[in-house]
C-alpha cells in the first residue's frame, strides 16, 4: 500500500511537469506552465508597446494578418499607433492631455482551444497619468476583452484582439 501511494504521488507530480497536459478532468484543454507564462509575457509586451507608442513593437506582437477590433494586418496596426501618437501630441499641445498613457489588464484567464491556440479573457482600462494635484490621473476608457492568441513558429502572437466583445 505504501509503495502504491508513493507511485501515485510521483505519477501525479510528473504529470504536472509534462510540457503539454492536453485534457483536464472536465474535458477542458490545458496549456503548459511555459505556454501560460509566454502568453502573459505577450500581453505585457502588448501593453508596453501600446503605452510607449512603439508601432514596430506593437505590430510585432500580432500575426501578419492579426487584428485589433476592425483594424487588420500589421501595416494597418502600425498606422493606428502612428495616428494615436499624433493625436496625443496634438491634445498635449492644447492642454487637453497630460501624463503618459497606461493600459491595465486584470482578472486575466487563459482558455486553451487547442495546443497552439488560446483565448485570453480580461478586464482592461486605459489611464493617463497626472502630473500633479491640479492634473490628476484620468481614466480614458475601460471594458472587457477577449483575445485569440496562436503559436507561430514557437512564438505566441495575437491573432485577434477584441476589446468590445458582445457578451
Summary of predicted features, one role per range:
Residues 24-40, 133, 152-167:
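Terminal "cap-and-tail" regions of soluble proteins that handle hydrophobic small molecules
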Residues 37, 99-101, 138-140:
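Transmembrane beta-barrel outer-membrane domains
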Residues 20-52, 56-61, 75:
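Short, low-complexity N-terminal intrinsically disordered segments enriched in polar/charged residues
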Residues 9-19:
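Bacterial N-terminal signal peptides
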Residues 127-139:
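Short, cysteine-centered beta-strand-loop-beta hairpins and adjacent loop/turn segments enriched
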Residues 1-10:
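Bacterial N-terminal signal peptides that target proteins for export
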Residues 117-121, 137-167:
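Short beta-strand edge/turn micro-motifs at domain boundaries
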Residues 55-125:
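A solvent-exposed, acidic/Ser-Thr-rich amphipathic alpha-helical stretch
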Amino acid at each position: 500500500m505504501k509503495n502504491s501511494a508513493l507511485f501515485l504521488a510521483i505519477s501525479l507530480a510528473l504529470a504536472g511537469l509534462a510540457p503539454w497536459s492536453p485534457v483536464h478532468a472536465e474535458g477542458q484543454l490545458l496549456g503548459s506552465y511555459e505556454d501560460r507564462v509566454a502568453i502573459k509575457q505577450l500581453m505585457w509586451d502588448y501593453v508596453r508597446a501600446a503605452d510607449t507608442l512603439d508601432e514596430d513593437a506593437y505590430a510585432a506582437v500580432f500575426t501578419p494578418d492579426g487584428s485589433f477590433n476592425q483594424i487588420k494586418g500589421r501595416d494597418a496596426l502600425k498606422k493606428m499607433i502612428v495616428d494615436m501618437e499624433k493625436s496625443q501630441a496634438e491634445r498635449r499641445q492644447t492642454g487637453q492631455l497630460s501624463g503618459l498613457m497606461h493600459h491595465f489588464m486584470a482578472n486575466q484567464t487563459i482558455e486553451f482551444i487547442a495546443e497552439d491556440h488560446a483565448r485570453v479573457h480580461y478586464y482592461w482600462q486605459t489611464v493617463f497619468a497626472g502630473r500633479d494635484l491640479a492634473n490628476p490621473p484620468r481614466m480614458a476608457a475601460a471594458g472587457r476583452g477577449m483575445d485569440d492568441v496562436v503559436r507561430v513558429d514557437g512564438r505566441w502572437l495575437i491573432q485577434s484582439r477584441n476589446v468590445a466583445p458582445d457578451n
